Amino acid sequence: MHSFQLLGLAAVGSVVSAAPTASRVSDLVKKSSSTCTFTSASEASETSSSCSNVVLSNIEVPAGETLDLSDAADGATITFEGTTSFGYEEWDGPLIRFGGKQLTITQSDGAVIDGDGSRWWDSEGTNGGKTKPKFMYVHDVEDSTIKGLQIKNTPVQAISVQATNVYLTDITIDNSDGDDNGGHNTDGFDISESTGVYISGATVKNQDDCIAINSGENILFTGGTCSGGHGLSIGSVGGRDDNTVKNVTISDSTVTDSANGVRIKTIYGDTGDVSEITYSNIQLSGITDYGIVIEQDYENGSPTGTPSTGVPITDVTVDGVTGSIEDDAVQVYILCGDGSCSDWTWSGVDITGGETSSDCENVPSGASC
């Protein structure tokens, strides 16, 4: 098991050598004591930076606009109240954007953030058809906590994280309505260019990856419940500005009625690095494609069957991945380039049902296929 380190929020701070002016002290006092309740997205976006407590009450975000809280005051608490809804327009989004330091983002009892994604769903996701807005950006956020959000029916990807030292706890993303209504590419959490991301107690019902880690380090996903999607994924890695995934632990989670259980995928012909990866105590049921799949052959979003070696996958621990898969599914599939997968440790892998694969290549010692 690899060490997992996050900077404690209590340790974050800076020392100011010069005493603030009287006017600066007055401004700080006003911000620390101000609670602002907004019922308008534009007002919240324009003036919330002056508030230490932001309440977003039954906001209806106009079509084609972002509920933009990227300039939130340091240390602010942001609370969703009632139902947050969004007008319909074909555009890229995001529908919500956060930014800032030492934020606490939460909701009141019974609140829901409802994307009403069925207006966009057409079974094509981001691959064509209607242009669908991304849902929530947690970008340029540092030393912050997001907890207890209830998110429903996102048009496509739900939460995009590009952040440093953030805690996302007890978040529910429920896109189960998309199962029969054309939901596609409705990823739960997409993580990239991040250091220190802790996701605990998430519930994700969707039609794509429960979590997808494309780049970043010191990432933990634990206590998750994932159903309907593509499983617990790293990648695809490659083809971006940052193509390193390091020190990731995914543990104590369940994956049900999904295409895959555990998945690592890298892009053919690209360069990067995937290392220090642990999957521990993952329970599977109703898996339709692969219980465990690790492959170095992705190109244009699909596997090719021909691996490359530019993104090595090293120091991988798979411990206690158990459960059942469907009759036509494959228990384990490993497709590595020559020498580009190494230092793997597997124990307690017990997947029943389905088939074994005869197409694995370059399986490193310590693993089995």
Curated annotation (Swiss-Prot):
PbH1 repeats lie at residues 141-162, 163-193, 194-215, 216-236, 245-266, 274-296, 308-353. Its EC number is 3.2.1.15. Keywords: Cell wall biogenesis/degradation, Disulfide bond, Glycoprotein, Glycosidase, Hydrolase, Repeat, Secreted, Signal, Zymogen. Residues 19-31 form a propeptide. It is found in: Secreted. The keyword Repeat applies. It is an enzyme of class 3 (hydrolase). Disulfide bonds join C36-C51, C210-C226, C336-C341, C360-C369. The active site is at D208, H230. It holds the Pfam family Glyco_hydro_28. Involved in maceration and soft-rotting of plant tissue. Hydrolyzes the 1,4-alpha glycosidic bonds of de-esterified pectate in the smooth region of the plant cell wall. Belongs to the glycosyl hydrolase 28 family. This is Probable endopolygalacturonase II. It comes from Aspergillus aculeatus.
